[in-house]
Swiss-Prot record:
Pfam family, one: Toxin_cobra-type
Gene3D superfamilies: CD59 (2.10.60.10)
Keyword Signal: no
Family of this protein: Belongs to the three-finger toxin family. Short-chain subfamily. Aminergic toxin sub-subfamily.
This protein's name: Muscarinic toxin 1
GO-annotated cellular components: extracellular region
Gene source species: Dendroaspis angusticeps (Eastern green mamba)
Annotated S-S bridges: C3-C24, C17-C42, C46-C58, C59-C64
SUPFAM superfamilies: Snake toxin-like
Protein keywords: Disulfide bond, G-protein coupled acetylcholine receptor impairing toxin, G-protein coupled receptor impairing toxin, Neurotoxin, Postsynaptic neurotoxin, Secreted, Toxin
Amino acid sequence: LTCVTSKSIFGITTENCPDGQNLCFKKWYYIVPRYSDITWGCAATCPKPTNVRETIRCCETDKCNE
């Protein structure tokens, strides 16, 4: 599985997930209007939001977390 790990004006960066990590995730942490801290990566299980400002989406295909 290949997941996106970062995005910039120059394109995306991906990584091949290690064995046992069969999900890609994208996590948004709301900071102020129109600005969120976004994290991408691989996971064995879908992470759970730690507070109400956090949204997490998980998926199972290559680069699906773009």
